[in-house]
C-alpha cells in the first residue's frame, strides 16, 4: 500500500512539474517575436507591457499572451501574428480593425466601441 501511494505521489509531482514548465512569465519584450513587438509598438505606442506569458507545448513555443498596463490582453501565435485582442477597459485601436468591418460598425453601431476582436 505504501508503495502504491509513493508511486501515485511521484506521478503527481512529475506531472505538476511538467505542467509548470509549460508556461514562462516575463516582462521582457525581447522574449516576443519581432512581429509581435512591432505590432505593439505600432498600435499601442504609449502603453507598457505588464506581463508576458509564453505557453510552451512539446518543447516549442505555442503562443504568447501579453497583458498591457491599460488592461488590454493581446494574444499572438508562435510566429508573432495576433490572434485575439481583448480591450475591455479601453477600446481596440481603429488601426487594427479591417476597413470593411470598421465601415460596417460605423454605419450600424455608431455609438458602440469595439472592445474585442479575433481572427
Predicted regions and their residues:
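Sec-dependent N-terminal signal peptides
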Residues: 4-13
